[in-house]
A protein has these predicted regions:
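Transmembrane alpha-helix termini and helix-breaking/packing motifs in multi-pass membrane transporters
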Residues: 20-24, 134-159, 229-236, 260-265
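Juxtamembrane intracellular "pre-TM" segments in multi-pass secondary transporters
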Residues: 175-211
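C-terminal ends and interior cores of transmembrane alpha-helices
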Residues: 68-82, 277-285
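Helix-loop boundary and gating motifs at the non-cytosolic
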Residues: 1-45, 203-246
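Helix-to-loop junctions at the C-terminal end of transmembrane segments
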Residues: 45-58, 148, 254-268
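Cytoplasmic helix-loop-helix junction between adjacent transmembrane helices
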Residues: 91-134
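Cytoplasmic membrane-interface "Motif A"-like loop-to-helix N-cap segments
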Residues: 56-67, 264-277
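Helix-loop junctions on the cytosolic side of multi-pass membrane transporters
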Residues: 152, 157-185
Length: 285
């Protein structure tokens, strides 16, 4: 699972993502934002039944399907030349992401339970995996920006072989036994989803948590999608994009390494409040 977490996203694309879509697919920034908003909604809708679907067909099969779809979506990005290519790619990204989210975290948590590990072990594992992914992104970013000076498509093509790694490892996973868990029919799962949605709508705390996550996610997306145009606006040559991305990802890597310890000391409530200015201030600046 660690390899899947590290190589989940294209390694050589992050530092030139927006500029490559603008130039290769001939899209404006406004069109990219609109497309992203539509696809996030699609992902949220599809994400609702994926947990139940993972219970029915199995976590491993869900992960395999998600990674196959994810690999296919990036092929559309790698060879994009028109806006509709990115529409297909992003819709596939939404579907693949929903399938993976319905299985990967549950599979890790069930494995932790099987190994008699507590919730802090899961947080530490998740932080370490995220940190290594940030570090890999950072180390690959300068290479990507230098290649992009010659051809914007080169970094995308270079990312393809690494996306095979999570796909192959998904086939090699062993799903832990779910002892004591009663198997439910499709009808039972549908009733559970209906009851879950009703209970969620009635619980103000859950609604506030969902709103908080939406705001944090949207703010992060805005920042991530705005840095390429900002670099261009201030006249920064593309070959330096990757070096700035390297610094940012090293900071993210260090934060992930010690994130679980900081969260454990500060507590969930304080950590949640600290995240708001940490994400909001950079956007304002």
């Amino acid at each position: 699972m660690m390899l899947q977490s590290i190589f989940l996203e294209p390694l050589f694309w992050g530092s030139i993502l927006i500029i490559s879509i603008q130039n290769l697919a001939h899209m404006t920034l406004e069109e990219i934002y609109f497309q992203e908003a539509v696809c996030v909604v699609i992902m949220l809708v599809i994400d609702i039944p994926t947990g139940a679907l993972a219970d029915i067909i199995g976590r491993k099969k869900m992960l395999v399907i998600g990674h196959v779809i994810g690999f296919t979506n990036f092929l559309f990005f790698a060879f994009m030349s028109e806006p509709w290519h990115t529409w297909v790619a992003n819709i596939l990204w939404s579907i693949g992401g929903a399938f993976r989210s319905g299985a990967d975290k549950a599979l890790i948590q069930e494995s932790c339970i099987g190994l008699d590990k507590d919730k802090h072990y899961y947080r530490k594992y998740a932080g370490k995996a995220s940190g290594l992914r940030f570090l890999m992104f950072g180390l690959c970013a300068p290479v990507a920006s230098y290649l992009a000076e010659y051809n914007l498509r080169f970094p995308l093509l270079l990312s393809i072989p690494f996306l095979v790694i999570p796909l192959v490892t998904a086939f090699m996973l062993t799903e832990p036994p779910r002892d004591g868990v009663r198997e439910l029919s499709v009808k039972d799962h549908l009733f559970q989803m209906k009851d879950g949605i009703i209970d969620t709508c009635k619980d103000k705390r859950i609604l506030w948590i969902m709103l908080y996550l939406c705001v944090i996610s949207a703010s992060s997306k805005i920042w991530f999608f705005a840095y390429n145009p900002y670099f261009e606006h201030v006249g920064l040559p593309i070959r330096y994009f990757g070096w700035i991305f390297l610094v940012l990802n090293v900071i993210a890597w260090l934060s992930s390494q010690y994130g679980s310890k900081i969260e454990h000391k500060l507590g969930d409530k304080v950590t949640v409040h600290i995240l708001i200015p940490l994400i909001g201030i950079p956007i304002i600046l």
